[in-house]
């Protein structure tokens, strides 16, 4: 088991691989199924993980995008994602990581405040996507969006890079810091 690196494998021709990471197995499975239903020009591979680091496997494909799914109804979900982030190489945060937050629609049941997750995404300079994955139509729309992001991150969309896309997905209330 080791740190997950973005460039440790060569890219595959017409193949895009996403890694969905969360403690919520049922939500991950439903999201993965919705993504696989989407029409994609390249071969789409979806890997699910409920923990990091991943086992060192020679046959594991190159991962083009990592999506950390955080359930606002579970502090455990946020704590585990924070732990998992330690096992991801910093090169992934150059446009190949995003956070997907679910459960924001029912604020009265949230045990994690939205601002906590916003700060986490801002700290890692990664986009934050909000979606209630319990609702089929929302899940399908998010799956289409993630497939499109994945195609860009895999380099299958001419003229757009992952880093360029992620800078466009940044929220306007969190402008880039002046320290850079």
Curated annotation (Swiss-Prot):
**Does the keyword section mention Lipid biosynthesis?**
no
What's this chain's function? Component of the CENPA-NAC (nucleosome-associated) complex, a complex that plays a central role in assembly of kinetochore proteins, mitotic progression and chromosome segregation. The CENPA-NAC complex recruits the CENPA-CAD (nucleosome distal) complex and may be involved in incorporation of newly synthesized CENPA into centromeres.
Record localization: Nucleus; Cytoplasm; Chromosome, Centromere, Kinetochore
GO biological process: what's one of them? chromosome segregation
Q: Which Gene3D superfamilies match?
A: P-loop containing nucleotide triphosphate hydrolases
- Which protein, by its recorded name, is this? Centromere protein M
* Major localization class: nucleus
Report which superkingdom the organism of origin falls in: Eukaryota
Query: Cellular component GO terms, alphabetically?
Result: cytoplasm; inner kinetochore; nucleus
InterPro entries recorded: Centromere_Cenp-M, P-loop_NTPase
Q: Which PANTHER family match?
A: CENTROMERE PROTEIN M
Q: Which Pfam families match?
A: CENP-M
Its keywords, alphabetically, are: Centromere, Chromosome, Cytoplasm, Kinetochore, Nucleus
The scientific name of the source species is Mus musculus (Mouse)
Whom does it interact with, and what assembly results?
Answer: Component of the CENPA-NAC complex, at least composed of CENPA, CENPC, CENPH, CENPM, CENPN, CENPT and CENPU. The CENPA-NAC complex interacts with the CENPA-CAD complex, composed of CENPI, CENPK, CENPL, CENPO, CENPP, CENPQ, CENPR and CENPS.
């Amino acid at each position: 088991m080791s740190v997950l690196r973005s460039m440790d494998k060569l890219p595959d021709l017409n193949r895009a691989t996403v890694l969905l990471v969360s403690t919520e197995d049922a939500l991950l499975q439903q999201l993965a199924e919705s993504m696989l239903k989407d029409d994609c020009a390249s071969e789409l591979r979806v890997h699910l993980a409920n923990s990091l680091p991943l086992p060192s496997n020679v046959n594991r494909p190159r991962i083009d995008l990592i999506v950390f799914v955080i359930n606002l109804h579970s502090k455990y979900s946020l704590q585990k994602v924070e732990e998992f982030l330690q096992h991801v190489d910093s090169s992934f945060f150059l446009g190949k990581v995003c956070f997907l937050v679910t459960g924001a629609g029912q604020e009265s049941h949230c045990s994690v405040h939205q601002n906590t997750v916003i700060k986490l995404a801002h700290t890692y300079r990664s986009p934050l996507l909000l979606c209630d994955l319990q609702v089929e139509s929302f899940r399908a729309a998010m799956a289409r969006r993630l497939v499109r992001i994945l195609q860009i991150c895999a380099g299958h969309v001419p003229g757009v890079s992952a880093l360029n896309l992620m800078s466009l997905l940044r929220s306007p209330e969190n402008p880039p810091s002046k320290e850079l």
